[in-house]
Amino acid sequence: MTTMNFYDDLVMQTQMNYSRHYPIYASGGTPYQLTDKKPLPYSEQIDRLVQEIKEADCVVVGGASGLSAAGGGDFYYEDNDSYRKYFRPFAEKYHFKGDFAGMGHPWKTREEYWGYLATFLHTTQTAPVRHPYLNLDALLKGKDFFILTTNQDTQFVKLYPEAKVAEIQGDHRFFQCAACCTDDTWDAVKPVADMVAAMGDGTKIPTDLIPRCPHCGGEAFPWVRGYGNFLQGKKYEEQYEKISRYVLEHKDSKILFLELGVGRMTPMFIQEPFWNLTLSFPHARYIAINNKYDFLPKQLEDKGMTIVADIAQVLRDARDTMENGDNNQ
């Protein structure tokens, strides 16, 4: 097995498991036997989280959608204040129940389709770093760490060099050819800003601003999985190479796998590989923070912990605990 495909192979293995047990996952469950140990009181969980971070030689953070949602990036699945703030013209015209509802809408024109898509991309490209990310950053201060994320919203790369972040589901800052005629990706930030500026308070962009592939002339598309023909070329392989190299270089260290906000749609990218690695590596530890799911495999009950609470609150409390402890030393 090469370094490049080590983590990719883990993902493929868990994808096969996901397919075999899809009804269980679709109902919000997991096919794995879970621990029946009673969880620690919340305050003790926070203390343990802080202690595990301090004692770890290195930390691998797995950041998923729940992390961004906890910081206000919660406009994907419901018509809430956040959605109205960014998508008001579309919300009032079409009454979508969140961003993803609009993504699946049968748009009558490409100009309006791109008006909606550009609005979405602009919200993430220009968003400030959200508080949960800042509190996580404070917890990682002075640590050797690496970030693995399925989020495409650019939050992590606003904080850290790209060498420390693996974006295995893509990145809203880049376009690709929708037909994958080329392995190239290119800047999406300026074209998106131009589309949003030209649209004003409307819902359509000018035809000549529809982004196109510089090679074949066909339409471009955001370099992200989930909305189209995701390009799994050189840039994609580089993401898996980064996480694979880091994990293999630290497999004998006291490594903490810290999972944040993984749901039931994509447990195969972060959660289950983290479980496998924690079980396999002799000094590995695992902590998951989730506002809904309490999934700790029985095989990991002595090497891990789940904290079922609001992610933003947990990271804020952990930061306060760590900083207060440091001040009292």
PLM region spans:
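Conserved catalytic alpha/beta core of Sir2/sirtuin-type deacylases, generalized to analogous enzyme cores
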Residues: T2-Q329
